[in-house]
């Protein structure tokens, strides 16, 4: 019986045999609920940059220096396509799919709203949301940290950031939740995307007539150079990217970090004793250890780099979460150590596409942790409950059932 | 052996043994011969190691041997897996990967493609050779719930999905129409023009043989021949796309033709216009609009004749055993006049897609089939089909998945992005038009050669348009097909036909 191309291991002639290492980024049997540790272990013996013949065949980059070299070289490694395996008519996101300098005006338009000053100003609102969400979850005793906390918090923050009508919180949360639950259902995603964009479009109209100091009003007014403002389509596209980028990421970094924290009673006791003093260090270490985004690149110009022949049309996957656990950069990289000296990592990538929300994302985890330990004495994994996960370009924890001892 | 396709054939072999079951190019296959021949085929299959549930793939143009092989396979408890005789080796290989047949049979013109796809087919002449011979019977009877066929359908995905019917679903489908349509009793004469590898061809064959009718199989649509056949053989049932009825009416001999034998005349795939209705009404015939899809078993609803006269474009209100709803995305029923997705429920619908639990769960929810089609019910519950959610191009009655064409076109060097849309075509109704963007125009002849090598001929684009600008996108980052359709509405009038 012949096999269709999709099932084949694809190894083009330019790929040398010593760089081939089998790994299925979507469903590798070696990866478990502790995704980061098991993923790292599975590829520990693979070369720094290797060719995975599965999923149409693509390069995988696991070392921090190699990742930095590729992320800062848009001339050879383009963001134009980000699908593995490559698909016909890949989606195009503003500004994610734009190589510099085209992406710069859009980043400049967003930057002031995501800087430390703006995020600091948002903190009281983040705190209020975190408290409210944790209180609601605690009412339940045993609950799913993902569904009840990690998934709802970033949606609320997104609405706050955009200046959305918070009386529609539940409606929009429900929309967001269904969107991320139906990732494999193209028809549902299409319908839900339409509804989300409908909400955004209504928001644009509202902010045109009654502007405020929130992000959507800022998008409407932002000078893109030469006095040009963004078209409605551009604003919608940017809003959609922020929606995608702001939810799944913070949700899953938080989820994986709390999965680990649930198994570390000593660290919980320290955080309980001094949440305000230690939450920043915890957030930093959570971000270093539990990155969830792997960034694809398309080779658009042949280049030999680090002994690897990258050829036009090859797909490359930068394993940011693995790069942030590079044992050449970190002592005991798989240990969550909040006393670790702060060192650069690549969870947020680097170069022209450095995550614009990195200050906000870190702040969300920090504030959530402070509010958590105001209310929680200790918590642990609920015994014998499965913790499903998915891998791919974004790694996600789909459920995290926890048992909680509330603070007295 | 109760409520199986095989039990119905055995019944008609007893009751109407000499009546033709199938007439193909003048060659007659009686129910008695069909019964004996298919029994011998079943015994041969079992002897070759075929077990209940195994797949038997068939890649051939229509022939009486094909018919015998279908009923023999079902009698042996195996599952018929028809392969489109137009398929290219790559399409065949992709299909075989999911069906994994125990045996593959091929017609003389299909052997080479199958070999190239990596299998060693048996020759259809092996089946032909069993037309005469000693009585033979398979040692066991098929069960009602055993699957009988996997029919490949084109959906909105790039790869076809296999619709699975069982003995029980196919007999229930036939039972519904026997109850509902007294105009097609046993002994009725039916024209069928569809290849047996299509849903229409396979379902008509099995439906009308379960019902004890005679099928006149035509190798292709020829309006003059059809008109002649209807009169000469006193044909009673005729189903086709509206364009076929128009071609027949355009024949000079139509004016004096005697069509009084026709009792059940249905049209699907496109709307029946008032003008078409009136042309045939002058001959005493009411063309009735149908709606259905492979997944529901075939037809789901036929417009009642007395209502079709006033509302030719409507499709009826379901059937004796077939319920229809039109719903909003959240599953609640639409108000009369409100558009929504058409849902259907019947004992004749598929049990699911072959080895595809995700797509099955999507299509079958709480006992209802979600059609992916948009429709609207009027205040009397009569359905009007509005549009298909699935991205299909329907060319000469054959469904083409736009995504599949796009996948192959995008493989061609120099093409950055491409969409396939339907261009109107006087002969086929619709035909594929491809709009692509790249750094420069590509060699269209070479592109078409690439498509020819990887796609069945009817899927190969007939028009190719180059766009110097990137194609329009939605805010979600996806290409916008509605915007491209609008930009290229009249493109077929300006562009040359490239094949």
Pin down the residues of each PLM region.
Chain A
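Cytochrome P450
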Residues: 1-408
């Amino acid at each position: 019986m012949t096999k269709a191309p999709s099932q084949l291991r694809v190894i083009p002639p330019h790929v040398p045999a010593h760089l081939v290492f089998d790994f299925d980024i979507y469903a590798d049997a070696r990866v478990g609920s502790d995704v980061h540790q098991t993923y790292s272990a599975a590829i520990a013996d693979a070369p720094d940059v290797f060719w995975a013949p599965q999923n149409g065949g693509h390069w995988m980059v696991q070392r921090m220096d190699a990742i930095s070299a590729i992320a800062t070289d848009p001339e050879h490694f383009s963001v134009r396509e980000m699908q593995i395996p490559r698909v016909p008519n890949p989606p195009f996101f503003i500004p994610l799919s734009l190589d510099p300098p085209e992406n710069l005006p859009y980043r400049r338009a967003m930057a002031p709203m995501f800087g430390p000053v703006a995020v600091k100003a948002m903190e009281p609102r983040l705190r209020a949301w975190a408290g409210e969400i944790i209180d609601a979850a605690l009412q339940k005793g045993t609950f799913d940290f993902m569904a009840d906390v990690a998934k709802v918090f970033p949606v609320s923050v997104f609405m706050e950031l955009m200046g959305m009508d918070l009386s529609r919180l539940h409606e929009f949360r429900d929309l967001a939740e269904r969107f991320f639950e139906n990732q494999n259902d193209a028809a549902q995603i299409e319908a839900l995307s339409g509804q989300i964009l409908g909400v955004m479009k209504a928001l644009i109209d509202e902010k045109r007539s009654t502007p405020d100091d929130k992000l959507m009003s800022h998008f409407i007014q932002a000078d893109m150079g030469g006095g040009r403002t963004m078209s409605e389509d551009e604003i919608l596209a940017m809003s959609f990217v922020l929606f995608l980028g702001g939810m799944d990421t913070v949700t899953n970094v938080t989820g994986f970090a709390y999965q680990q924290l649930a198994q570390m009673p000593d660290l919980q006791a320290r955080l309980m004793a001094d949440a305000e003093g230690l939450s920043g260090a915890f957030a930093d270490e959570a971000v270093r250890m539990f990155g969830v985004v792997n960034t694809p690149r398309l080779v658009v110009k042949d280049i030999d780099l680090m002994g690897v022949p990258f050829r036009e049309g090859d797909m490359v996957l930068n394993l940011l979460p693995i790069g942030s656990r590079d044992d050449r950069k970190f002592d005991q990289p798989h240990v969550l150590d909040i006393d670790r000296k702060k060192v650069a990592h690549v969870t947020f990538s680097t170069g022209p596409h450095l995550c614009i929300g990195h200050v906000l994302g870190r702040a969300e985890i920090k504030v959530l942790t402070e509010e958590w330990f105001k209310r929680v004495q200790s918590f642990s994994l609920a015994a014998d409950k499965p913790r499903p996960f998915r891998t791919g370009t974004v790694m996600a924890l789909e459920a995290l059932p926890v048992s909680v001892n509330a603070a007295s | 052996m109760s409520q199986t396709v095989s039990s119905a054939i055995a019944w008609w072999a007893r009751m109407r043994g000499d009546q033709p079951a199938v007439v193909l190019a003048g060659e007659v296959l009686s129910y008695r011969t069909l019964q004996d021949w298919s029994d011998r085929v079943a015994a041969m299959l079992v002897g070759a190691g075929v077990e209940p549930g195994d797949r038997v793939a068939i890649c051939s143009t229509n022939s009486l041997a094909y018919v015998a092989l279908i009923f023999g396979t079902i009698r042996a408890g195996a599952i018929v897996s028809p392969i489109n005789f137009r398929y290219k080796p790559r399409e065949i290989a992709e299909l075989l990967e999911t069906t994994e047949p125990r045996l593959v049979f091929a017609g003389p013109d299909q052997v080479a493609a199958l070999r190239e796809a990596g299998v060693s087919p048996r020759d259809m002449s092996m089946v032909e050779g069993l037309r005469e011979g000693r009585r033979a019977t398979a040692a066991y009877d098929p069960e009602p719930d055993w699957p009988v066929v996997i029919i490949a359908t084109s959906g909105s995905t790039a790869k076809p999905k296999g619709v699975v019917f069982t003995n029980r679903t196919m007999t229930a489908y036939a039972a519904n129409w026997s109850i509902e349509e007294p105009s097609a009793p046993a002994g009725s004469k039916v024209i069928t023009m569809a290849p047996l590898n299509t849903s229409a061809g396979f379902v008509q064959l099995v439906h009308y043989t379960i019902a004890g009718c005679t099928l006149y199989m035509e190798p292709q649509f020829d309006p003059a021949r059809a008109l002649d056949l209807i009169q000469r053989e006193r044909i009673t049932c005729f189903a086709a796309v509206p364009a076929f009825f128009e071609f027949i009416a355009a024949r000079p001999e139509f004016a004096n033709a005697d069509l009084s034998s026709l009792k059940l005349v249905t049209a699907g795939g496109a709307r029946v216009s008032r003008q078409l209705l009136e042309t045939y009404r002058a001959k005493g015939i009411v063309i009735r609009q149908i709606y259905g899809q492979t997944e529901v078993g075939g037809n789901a609803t036929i417009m009642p004749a007395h209502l079709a006269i006033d509302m030719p474009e409507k499709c009826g209100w379901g059937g004796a055993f077939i319920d229809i709803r039109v719903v909003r995305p959240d599953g609640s029923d639409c108000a009369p006049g409100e558009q929504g997705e058409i849902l259907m429920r019947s004992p004749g619908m598929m049990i699911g897609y072959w080895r595809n639990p995700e797509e099955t769960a999507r299509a079958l929810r709480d006992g209802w089939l979600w059609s992916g089609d948009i429709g609207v019910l009027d205040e009397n519950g009569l359905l009007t089909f509005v549009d298909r959610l699935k991205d299909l191009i329907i060319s000469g009655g054959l469904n083409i998945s736009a995504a599949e064409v796009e996948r192959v076109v995008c493989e061609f060097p120099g093409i950055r992005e491409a969409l396939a849309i339907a261009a109107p075509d006087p002969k086929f109704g619709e035909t594929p038009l491809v709009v692509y963007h790249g750094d420069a125009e590509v060699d269209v002849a070479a592109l078409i050669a690439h498509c020819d090598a990887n796609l069945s001929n009817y899927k190969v684009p007939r028009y190719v348009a180059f766009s110097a600008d990137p194609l329009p996108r939605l805010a979600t980052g996806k290409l916008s097909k509605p915007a491209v359709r609008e930009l290229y509405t009249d493109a077929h009038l300006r562009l040359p036909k490239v094949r």
